[in-house]
């Protein structure tokens, strides 16, 4: 009898079984005595699948193993698909090796080691390329520029450049000097021209009052309109006139009796003349008439109690009528004339304010028999000096604030003019720009309103300071 070891399929117990000689492995399944069909078991011998018809050998170990319960199948196809994907991928750097290191890090270390090994080779190749480049440059033919003509031209050009710069500086300095001399000549010419070009020589006519013609009087009036009262030409003619008067008064021929002196000092009518004069007004002034036709007359020329002067700067015709007087009176009249010139200049500066003609006649202006003293020569009526305060009164009235309630419409405010409206708007801290109609409408809109009721958009913006 043979003895074999048999491992049970259900309990996995190993037991010794005695079998008859020549028994097969199928006999072990029949001895198990299970209700499970024999087809659901198979036998292995020492880990190898044994055939059911194989004879049992003594001392061997046989195991009865149940078969696995299979499903409907299809799991193999899934394994095949997964295996195909595994075979297709080529990037396994995210995987780890058996030591737990990522393959990416391992590959980097290998590449770095190889690069360090090849560093010496790279340096050698670089040096070799540099030497080859130097050899190629040395092999090329060298060019030496030794043209003497070229060097000569360069030297000549540098010298010519220096000479041209020196000439340019000299020309610029000479042009500046000529410009300064031209300015000096122009200033001298202007200074000489400001003194005025004298026309004909002054002539003293006596007893020829009726010889002046209408043309000469018209030219005189036109020249008076064109002549500025504060021009340098009038001042130079005044100074020459006074010097001539002094010389004539100091001469022995001009001495007269005390009766004539007293009579001459009391004669003459005082007039204040300003405005535009005509030929009729010049006749009246020369003939000493006391009446005025009611129109404004321009204050003409330097006048004194010693005589009257009628001048025309355009044609150079001058008519001078002079009476004998003492030097003391002439000096006093000169002082009064200077004050009257200043008042005239102030009056013209104050927008040409016209002063009405006032005639003051003295009872001793004419003789008892109607004859004029000094051999029929009528003395010119002297002009009364006008004080600065009297002439400044109208200008002060202009700058004084106006009463807006006196104006009924904005059109009436337009008559004040742009400058006056600008001053009034500036006094109220309002916007003062725009046309005449806009300024008048803006000023009329705030008529009679207190400051807190005025539209804020009408106020002018405060001036911004400069940024530092």
UniProtKB/Swiss-Prot annotation:
Q: Which regions are flagged for Polar residues bias? A: 345-374, 384-397
Using the record for this protein, list the coiled-coil segments as residue ranges, or answer none.
112-143
Bias kind Low complexity: ranges: 228-239, 251-266, 303-314, 329-340
Extract the InterPro entries matched here. Answer: RNA_Proc_DNA_Dmg_Regulator, SDE2-like_dom, SDE2/SF3A3_SAP, Sde2_Ubi
Q: What is a single cellular component term in the Gene Ontology annotation?
A: cytoplasm
Extract one GO molecular function annotation from the record. Answer: DNA binding
Tell me what PTMs the record reports for this protein: Upon binding to PCNA, the N-terminal UBL (ubiquitin-like) propeptide is cleaved at Gly-71 by an unidentified deubiquitinating enzyme; the resulting mature SDE2 is degraded by the DCX(DTL) complex in a cell cycle- and DNA damage dependent manner.
The record's subcellular locations are: Nucleus; Cytoplasm
Pinpoint motif PIP-box by residue range: 33-46
Report the Pfam families cross-referenced here.
SDE2, SDE2_2C, Sde2_N_Ubi_vert
Q: Residues at site: Cleavage?
A: 71-72
Domain SAP as annotated: residue spans = 413-447
Would I find Glycoprotein among this entry's keywords? no
Propeptide stretches in the record: 1-71
Q: What family does the database annotate?
A: Belongs to the SDE2 family.
* Official protein name in the record: Splicing regulator SDE2
Lineage start: Eukaryota, Metazoa, Chordata, Craniata, Vertebrata
């Amino acid at each position: 009898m043979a003895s074999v070891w048999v491992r049970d399929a259900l309990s996995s117990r190993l037991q010794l079984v005695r079998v008859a000689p020549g028994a097969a492995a199928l006999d072990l399944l029949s001895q198990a005595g299970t209700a499970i069909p024999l087809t659901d078991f198979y036998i292995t011998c020492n880990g190898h699948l044994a055939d059911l018809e194989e004879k049992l050998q003594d001392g061997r170990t046989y195991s009865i193993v149940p078969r696995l319960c299979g499903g409907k199948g299809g799991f193999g196809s899934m394994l095949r698909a997964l295996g195909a994907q595994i075979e297709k991928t080529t990037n396994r750097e995210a995987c780890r090796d058996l030591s737990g290191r990522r393959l990416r890090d391992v590959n980097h270390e290998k590449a770095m080691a190889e690069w360090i090994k090849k560093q010496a080779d790279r340096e050698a190749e670089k040096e070799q390329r540099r030497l080859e480049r130097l050899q190629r440059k040395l092999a090329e033919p060298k060019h030496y520029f030794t043209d003497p003509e070229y060097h000569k031209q360069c030297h000549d050009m540098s010298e010519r450049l220096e000479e041209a710069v020196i000439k340019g500086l000299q020309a610029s300095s000479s042009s500046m000097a000529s410009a300064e001399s031209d300015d000096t000549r122009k200033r001298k010419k202007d200074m000489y021209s400001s003194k005025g070009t004298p026309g004909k020589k002054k002539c003293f006519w006596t007893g020829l009052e009726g010889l002046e013609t209408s043309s000469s009087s018209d030219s005189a009036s036109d020249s008076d309109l064109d002549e500025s009262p504060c021009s340098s030409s009038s001042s130079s003619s005044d100074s020459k006139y006074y010097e001539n008067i002094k010389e004539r008064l100091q001469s022995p021929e001009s001495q007269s009796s005390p009766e004539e002196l007293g009579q001459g000092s009391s004669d003459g009518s005082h007039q204040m003349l300003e405005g535009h004069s005509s030929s009729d007004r010049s006749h009246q002034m020369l003939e000493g008439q006391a009446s005025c036709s009611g129109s404004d007359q321009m204050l003409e020329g330097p006048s004194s109690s010693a005589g009257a002067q009628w001048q025309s700067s355009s044609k150079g015709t001058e008519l001078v009528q002079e009476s004998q007087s003492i030097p003391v009176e002439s000096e006093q009249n000169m002082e009064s004339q200077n004050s009257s010139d200043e008042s005239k200049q102030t009056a013209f500066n104050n927008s040409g304010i016209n002063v009405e003609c006032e005639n003051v006649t003295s009872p001793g202006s004419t003789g008892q028999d109607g004859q004029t003293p000094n051999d029929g020569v009528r003395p010119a009526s002297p002009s009364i000096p006008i004080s600065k305060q009297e002439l400044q009164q109208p200008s002060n009235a202009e700058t004084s604030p106006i009463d807006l309630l006196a104006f009924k419409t904005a059109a009436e405010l337009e008559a004040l003019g742009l400058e006056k409206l600008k001053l009034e708007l500036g006094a109220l801290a309002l916007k003062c720009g725009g046309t005449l109609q806009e300024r008048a409408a803006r000023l009329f809109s705030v008529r009679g309103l207190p400051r807190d009721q005025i539209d804020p958009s009408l106020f002018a913006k405060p001036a911004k300071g400069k940024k530092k």
